[in-house]
Amino acid sequence: MGVAQEALELARGGAQTGEFVFRVSDVQECAASGQDDCSESACAPVSASISAGEKPFEVATVVRLGVSMPYVPAVPYVVALGLCQFLRAADESFGVHWPYDICYKDQVIASIKATAGYQEGMFAVVSIAADPKVLCSAFDVADNTELLANKVSELVVQSVSVWEQQVKRARSFAGPIALILSDYFDMVPLLGQQVNKVYPSGNVALTARFGGIDVWGHAILVDQDGKEILVSEEEASVVPAV
């Protein structure tokens, strides 16, 4: 069972905001609630033999939501923004790779997913799979992956909490990510560049300029004739044109 599924089970069992599950490598797992200790063997440092590009560290955090359902699709964007802002405070080479991966220069170093559910209120489980070496350095935790999981989960909770306050102050609903869109724009390095729209099969559908992102999270591509093409995350990915 993956950490996201474990966290979902915890949430359905009444787990509260901030409870999390994390795993290091494919076989080591650790569940934690707040500051609870885990066994030393389950939280061992990542092996130096792990190859570049793999993301053997994963943490899934339960967040009880205080927003209405139309806002829920924004959660992974909110977390991506919060994590990226934190990372960019130390190094501006970090960015958001649409829709909500974290990149360092041209390399994706963290992937974010969110799964919503309802049990004693609306909740989301936010899972982050990442290169632990990059995050350990950014969060200044050496090779302590348990502490890293705790700090990442705290940042997830903080990011969602700040956004929820924005939602509560908003006078009307303008789209799930409308309230963070301006800040989100600033984190996406591919905006304005030539990109390929790539289907899940790997086929390139078109090459166009990455013109923007709408309030629903769609990428807006602009072709050579000035026509705007909306791309959803389910339909295709957007990558730099070669």
Feature roles, as predicted:
Residues 97-100:
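Short Gly/Ser/Thr- and Asp/Glu-enriched loop/turn motifs at secondary-structure junctions
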Residues 20-32, 46-49, 139-141, 237-239:
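Generic preference for hydrophobic/aromatic residues in regular secondary structure cores
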Residues 1-43:
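Conserved catalytic/binding loops enriched for acidic/polar residues
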Residues 2-16, 65-94, 104-242:
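Long, positively charged amphipathic alpha-helical accessory segments at protein N-termini or as interdomain linkers
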Residues 26, 61, 223:
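Pocket-edge structural micro-motifs
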Residues 39-69, 75-79:
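DPxDG-like acidic metal-binding loop motif
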Residues 23, 60-62, 123-125:
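Ordered hydrophobic segments in well-structured contexts
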